[in-house]
Amino acid sequence: AHSRRNEKASLKNIFDLCEFFVNLHVISKPMPVKKKKSVDLSTQPIGVFDSGIGGLTVANAIQKVLPHESLVYFGDTAHLPYGDKSPDSIKYYSIRIAQFLMQKNCKMIVIACNTASSIAFETVKDFVGGKIPVVDVISPVVEIVTHNKNIHKVGVIGTKGTIKSDIYAKKIKAASKKEVASLATPLLAPMIEEGFFNNKISRSVIASYL
């Protein structure tokens, strides 16, 4: 009975996390399986990954909303930035990371990377095979934009991979009649990774793009 209560409490935390991401859709649904011994989800961590340290902002937000949850963060600094990598490479890296997080017994995977979310989300979902939920960072932005009646024009900046995928424009236009303008900003990710943000250099780079 205690294990069942812990499982229910942990599942509530997962739903709270999804609500925090603004009605984020949990794409992966558990596949029908034979009944097994119940697992205490409260002891399993939430896996978060990004191409570098940028996803730590997502991990930090999760910890604020779910302070009792443990996290496993994977920053793939060996291959950053993902934005200039081929789709096949990004899918390969994402699968390897998902495999690592599953080996760490994570009960959920959060793809805290726009490039990986736009290119490898379906690949990761297929690899996981419905064993655990997989969520991305694109869906909540689309939800906010499409449901806000005061937003009529949307500007999207991102890595070359994210912009080339056109994922934001496709999803926003599919759910609304809003105008979308996209711009690749390949210098932003490495600049942030190197610690150049909120200073003269970062402001100059941003100004040159805008």
Each predicted region: which residue ranges?
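Short, low-complexity, charge-dense intrinsically disordered segments
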Residues: 1-9, 14-28
